[in-house]
Design a protein with these regions (language model features):
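Extended, low-complexity, turn-rich repeat/linker tracts enriched in Gly/Pro/Ser/Thr and Asp/Glu
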Residues: 39-43, 92-101
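C-terminal partner/receptor-binding element of secreted or periplasmic proteins
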Residues: 120-197
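Bacterial Sec-dependent N-terminal signal peptides
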Residues: 7-33, 194
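Exposed low-complexity, polar/acidic, P/S/T/G-rich flexible segments that act as propeptides
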Residues: 97-113
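Tryptophan-paired
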Residues: 54-90
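Short, ordered, surface-exposed loop/turn motifs in non-cytosolic proteins
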Residues: 41-55
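Noncatalytic modules at the cell exterior or secretory-pathway interfaces
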Residues: 27-38, 79-88
Length: 197
């Protein structure tokens, strides 16, 4: 009996207090990314208003004054919805000319989950697509009316699913794309390693 008691005492004495501790969960962090980029000619012939969903779920608007508009927002909350639409309105003073019109709209996110998993995903228009040629005010107006909308919901698990976001006046008939090209383009803008795509 004395030998059994000493064995139990020795085994418990060798045990570390760290054996019973579990690693505390990491704090969840989500970074939302939005990018709108237009060709030089777009700003010559149109006004661009960027509509997006912020980290609280509220819809926001900002006037685009340069070729590239970028927004990065931080939140700790999932699920969330991201939405982006560049409302492109032709100027009343458009004259005939040789215009090369292009808009890139991309939305993405990086989720660092409490379980340590990191997910990077994004949707948008093809950044490699060729510009559209327009010569008349009517052709410019027709192009402006086709500005694509990006929309998706990110689940509590960190995965995205496409959805429609109504900004009033936008159409969601143009499908979003996701692929390594969009992901790599987004990574390069925000300084992330494109190998994550």
């Amino acid at each position: 009996m004395l030998i059994c008691g000493l064995t139990v005492t020795m085994l418990s004495a060798c045990s570390s207090d760290d054996d019973n501790k579990t690693e505390p969960p990491q704090e969840q962090a989500v970074k939302m990314f939005y990018v709108v980029e237009v060709s030089d000619d777009v700003l010559k012939v149109a006004d661009v208003e960027v509509n997006y969903v912020d980290q609280t779920g509220a819809k926001q608007k900002e006037v685009m004054t340069s070729k590239k508009w970028i927004k990065a927002l931080d939140t700790k909350t999932l699920p969330l919805t991201e939405g982006l639409w560049a409302r492109i309105t032709p100027k009343s003073t458009v004259t005939s000319g040789d215009y090369q019109l292009k808009v890139i709209t991309v939305a993405g996110y990086q989720a660092q989950l409490a379980n340590g998993k990191s997910i990077f995903d994004g949707y948008g228009s093809d950044p490699e697509a060729a510009p559209t040629a327009a010569q008349t005010a009517e052709e410019v107006a027709a192009w402006c009316a086709k500005s694509p909308t990006v929309g998706f919901t990110v689940s509590e698990e960190g995965y995205a699913k496409q959805t429609s976001v109504d900004f009033g006046g936008n159409t969601s008939s143009t499908p979003n794309i996701f692929g390594s090209g969009v992901c790599e383009w987004l990574c390069s803008l925000f300084g992330y390693n494109p190998d994550r795509c």
